[in-house]
From Swiss-Prot:
Protein name: Small ribosomal subunit protein uS9m
Keyword terms of this UniProt record: Mitochondrion, Ribonucleoprotein, Ribosomal protein, Transit peptide
Pfam families for the chain: Ribosomal_S9
Origin: domain of life: Eukaryota
Function recorded in the entry: Component of the mitochondrial ribosome (mitoribosome), a dedicated translation machinery responsible for the synthesis of mitochondrial genome-encoded proteins, including at least some of the essential transmembrane subunits of the mitochondrial respiratory chain. The mitoribosomes are attached to the mitochondrial inner membrane and translation products are cotranslationally integrated into the membrane.
Amino acid sequence: MMASLRHSITSALRSSRQGCSKSAQWQSLDQQFGALRISSRSLSTHAHDHNPNVDGQFIAAPALSIDNFKLHPYARAVPVSPSYFTRTPRFYDNYLSLEKLMEEYEDLPVIPATAVERVAWKTLEDIRKELGEQVKASEFARCLALVKRLNSIHPDLKPQEIKDVLDSFRRNVQPFTNVAKPIPIDQFGRACGVGKRKASSARAFVVEGTGEVLVNGKTLAEYFGRVHDRESAVWALRATNRIDKYNVWVKVEGGGTTGQAEAITLAIAKALLAHEPALKPALRRAGCVTRDPRKVERKKHGHVKARKMPTWVKR
């Protein structure tokens, strides 16, 4: 009897204790969830005190300052150029830009090679001096091939960005656009031409006449003793059948008779073109308008002449 009474009292006390602990536990959980309750307005950077549904005061977070942001000491700096780790980064940047333009405008029509404008592109030495990098010849050749391919695009369809890139590869001086000034004819009907050969230089004044030729105030027969030199001096007139239609007065100096005669040929041809420009193809075929750049080769020490060596004797 006493045992059963003791057991009932013990079970009653145990149940009351568990009820108290569970109620306290649920009360603490309610407080924690209340503290963690987050509304959509609490995520805003502005406080909404006028809203009665929000309990308590909300203060906006301070603004972030990028100036005061400190970089991590072990952070890796990103290179400015994708070609930073190459041997010639500036050159490869230009090369990649050309490849990008080529991929974008590859389908544009091109003109024949004979119709493409002649342009003097920068040389390998110019690129090396401009970029300050030791560019390889093979790499520069590939780059120049892309430049010429872009330059062959039809001028009416060529975009402005391609023109800007091509201008950066052009030389400052374009020799193909330099045109020689035409020789004027003075008030007396004279045209003055200048010619050079070896160490000789000649100035020829050509005027319409009957075919008289004076060299330093003398006739051809008096000035040149050799028939070959006489024929060479007036070869420009004889090749165009104008030997009896113009009078020529020549001032020549320097060199020998052969050099003076060929210098006179070039001078007369240039002056004749001032009177009749249509004769240029005939004079070119006759070899009268192209200057001969050959000069006497100098003598070397140990040689008898420029090339000749002394006779070798075995003993």
